Amino acid sequence: MVKSNKPRKIHLNANPTPEALAELSIGDIVYLDGTVYTAREGIYKRVLEDGIAMPLDLPAKSAANFHCSPAATQHDDGSFDLGAVTATASFRFSKWIGPWLAASGAKLIIGKGGMSSQDYRDHFVPHGAIYLTTVGYGTGALLGRGVKQVRDLHWKEELGLAQAMWVLDVENFGPFIVESDLEGNSLFERENARIAAS
């Protein structure tokens, strides 16, 4: 819902309540606490097209899907160091986003550059989900500071590190900008229209 032109700083749980989501306005600055997971085309194809069961109990464990390929180093003991968690462009996943929201119960999609307002209206609004965008380029290391630990890693052998599902415990993870709200409004489209009209 569009409530104000002034952005606010919001701390949001990665399993947000409907009430918490309803309070968000496009342009708000969001920091996440809780557990987020990465999923992109490899995961989407495996679950939605190949019919393989999800490796994580969603949305109970997390309702926040990050479009990301972590820059990770794996140690001999199996633990990881994440140097950066850099978002990837979400528009590439448009064909899967509706079915994924339905299957996963995700309420937060996090990525780079947003998606179309048509995607927001057709897929996000019916599922009570919003889109959070990263802030510019080169923020992967900044976001990495908010990752407290790698809780789990699923389908590494099948998909490789970039496409595997990373399950990350995060704290003060951000900043992200609310790009879409529960009504399907798009911050980027609103600002582009204002620029075009000026």
What are the roles of these predicted feature ranges?
Residues 7-11, 150-198:
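Acidic, glycine-rich flexible loop/linker segments
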Residues 13-19:
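Short alpha-helix capping/helix-loop boundary micro-motifs
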Residues 18, 29, 35-39:
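Short, charged beta-turn/beta-strand-edge "cap" motif at the junction between a beta-strand
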Residues 24-25, 30:
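Short, well-ordered loop/turn sites that connect or cap secondary structure elements
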Residues 30-32, 66, 178:
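Short hydrophobic-aromatic micro-motifs
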Residues 38-173:
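Feature captures the catalytic cores and cofactor-binding loops of soluble hydro-lyases/lyases
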